[in-house]
């Protein structure tokens, strides 16, 4: 006769290990620690002022864009990233982004793209309210920090049509 308690204990330990592994994976996917969201003002279809009060770093911004665990940009967008395989085709190519959008327009598209298109599939990278189907690791946390948003904006404004 099997001991039910020991089989249950093994299943519980196994389930706890799986839950712990999934939690570790989710928290390592890029969600930033809770931070106080910095205020911003939307003017028309743009956020004209930097979220941080300073310009971002385009080199760091490029790193965020190509990091599939952090920025997730290349899941939907393609761009001038020859070293990156399997770039997305669902959204506009990022090549020439600053020829199509101003710095402020790019910032709003990153912070809250639903302000421009309520049906967009693009995530709001700097918003924590009015979101649906958000994983536990992402709740009450922006995907990117204000500094990372500014870094991505700084990178995107370097992408001009040739």
Model-based region annotation:
Residues 19-28:
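Bacterial N-terminal signal peptides
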Residues 36, 125-162:
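C-terminal capping alpha-helices of c-type cytochrome domains
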Residues 27-35:
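Bacterial Sec-dependent signal peptides at the C-terminal "C-region" and cleavage site
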Residues 36-68:
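Electrostatic cytochrome c docking/interface patches
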Residues 1-11:
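N-terminal secretory signal peptides that target proteins for export/translocation
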Residues 51-55, 64-66, 74, 78-115, ...:
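Gly/Gly-Pro-rich "capping" loops immediately C-terminal to redox-active cysteine motifs
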Residues 7, 15-19:
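Acidic, Ala/Val/Gly-enriched low-complexity intrinsically disordered segments
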